[in-house]
UniProtKB/Swiss-Prot annotation:
Epimerizes UDP-galactose to UDP-glucose. It comes from Rickettsia akari (strain Hartford). InterPro entries: CapD_C (IPR013692), NAD(P)-bd_dom_sf (IPR036291), Polysac_CapD-like (IPR003869), Polysaccharide_Synthase-Rel (IPR051203). Its EC number is 5.1.3.2. This is UDP-glucose 4-epimerase.
Length: 341
C-alpha cells in the first residue's frame, strides 16, 4: 500500500497522528514506507513524539496549515497526505469562529492547493459528524471544508490528485473528549458533570478512526466521502459505565448543554443516504459530478431517488450499560488508566 512512498500527516502530533503511527510502527507498513512527515505547529509535542517513537523514518516539520508557504514546502516529494490538522473543540470555536475558519477552512484550502501543486497522488481529509446539519461554528467550518474538498475534486482531472473525505463520529478517549474528563473527575473524587443525560453520541475508537482512513485510502475514488457505521450511547450510560469500571461512587450532576452542542449527531444526511453506497461496515457517498448546466440533467432524469432517514446517533445501534462497559474495556487508554488508578 505504501511501498517506497512518502506520507505526510498534518496535525500529526494529535490523537489521530499518534494512533496511525502506532499502527504503522507495530506492523510491516513501517518497513515498506519510505518516510512519514509529521507536520504541526507545536514543537514540544513534536519533540515528545520524536523521543517516544524514535524511528528514523519519521521526519518532523514545524509549520501551520494557515501558512501556505510552510505547508507547500513541507509537501515537496510527498505521495500521500492525511489531513488531520483542525480546531475541534465545539465551545472554543463558538467563541472564536474566525479561528475555526482560518484553520478548518482556509487551512484546508492551503493543504489541498499544496497537494495539487506538488502532484500528491491522494489526500484523505478528516471531517466530523458535526459537519452534517451543522449548528455550531466547528461543524459549519468542517462542512465548508468538506464542500471545499469536493469542489476541488471536481476540478482535478483523471490521473491527478485524488481527494477523499472521511467523516468521524465521536472518537472515544481522543484529546479533549468527554471520557478523559469523566475519568479525571472519578479519580479526583469530584461530581461527574453531564450536560444532558439523554444526549447520544457515536462511539468510535482510535483504532476505528485509523481503519476508516485506511479504508478510504484503499477504496476511495475522486470526491468520495466515507463514513464508518458505529454504535452509540447516551452520555448518562457512558458515565455510569465508567463509574462501574472504576468502582466509583461519585455523584452525577447535570449541568445543561454547552455552547453549540446538539442533542444527537448525524453522520449521513437523508439527502446523502439517497445516493450512498452501503459497503457493509461503511457508507460511501459519491461526489455529485454534475456541472452547473442543470438543464441536461433534468432531461436525462435521476437514476435513483429515495426518501430515507438520516443516519444518526439516535437511530443507529444503541448500546446498553453492559455493552458500553465491554466496549470501553477494549480501549488501551482505559486499561492504562485502570493500571494507574
Amino acid at each position: 500500500m505504501f511501498v517506497d512512498k512518502t506520507l505526510m500527516i498534518t496535525g500529526g502530533t494529535g490523537s489521530f497522528g499518534n494512533a496511525v503511527l502506532s499502527r504503522f510502527l507495530k506492523s510491516d507498513i513501517i518497513n515498506d514506507i519510505k518516510e512519514i512527515r509529521i507536520f504541526s505547529r507545536d514543537e514540544k509535542k513534536q519533540e515528545d513524539m520524536r523521543i517516544a517513537l524514535s524511528n528514523p523514518k519519521l521526519k518532523f516539520y514545524i509549520g501551520d496549515v494557515r501558512n501556505y508557504k510552510s505547508i507547500d514546502e513541507a509537501m515537496r516529494g510527498v505521495d500521500y497526505v492525511f489531513h488531520a490538522a483542525a480546531l475541534k473543540q465545539v465551545p472554543t470555536c463558538e467563541f472564536y469562529p474566525m479561528e475555526a475558519i482560518n484553520t478548518n477552512v482556509l487551512g484546508a484550502e492551503n493543504v489541498l492547493s499544496a497537494a495539487i501543486n506538488n502532484k500528491v497522488a491522494k489526500v484523505i481529509v478528516l471531517s466530523t459528524d458535526k459537519a452534517v446539519y451543522p449548528i455550531n461554528a466547528m461543524g459549519l467550518s468542517k462542512a465548508l471544508m468538506e464542500k471545499l474538498s469536493i469542489a476541488k475534486a471536481r476540478m482535478c482531472s483523471q490521473g491527478e490528485t485524488v481527494l477523499c473525505v472521511t467523516r468521524y463520529g465521536n472518537v472515544m478517549a481522543s484529546r479533549g473528549s468527554v471520557i478523559p474528563l469523566f475519568i479525571n473527575q472519578i479519580k479526583q473524587g469530584k461530581e461527574l458533570t453531564i450536560t444532558e443525560p439523554s444526549m447520544t453520541r457515536f462511539l468510535m475508537s482510535l483504532v476505528d478512526s485509523v481503519d476508516l482512513v485506511l479504508y478510504a485510502f484503499e477504496h476511495g475514488r475522486q470526491g468520495d466521502i466515507f463514513v464508518q457505521k458505529s454504535p452509540a450511547s447516551t452520555i448518562e450510560i457512558l458515565a455510569k459505565a465508567l463509574q462501574e469500571i472504576f468502582g466509583s461512587k461519585n455523584k452525577i450532576r447535570f449541568i445543561g448543554t454547552r455552547h453549540g452542542e446538539k442533542h444527537y449527531e448525524s453522520l449521513v444526511s437523508s439527502e446523502d443516504m439517497a445516493k450512498a453506497d452501503d459497503l457493509g461496515g461503511y457508507y460511501r457517498i459519491p461526489m455529485d459530478g454534475r456541472d452547473l448546466n442543470y438543464a441536461k440533467y433534468f432531461v436525462e432524469g435521476e437514476k435513483k431517488v429515495a426518501l430515507l432517514e438520516d443516519y444518526t446517533s439516535h437511530n443507529t445501534k444503541r448500546l446498553n450499560l453492559e455493552e458500553v462497559k465491554k466496549l470501553l474495556l477494549t480501549l488501551d487508554y482505559i486499561q492504562e488508566e485502570l493500571k494507574n488508578a
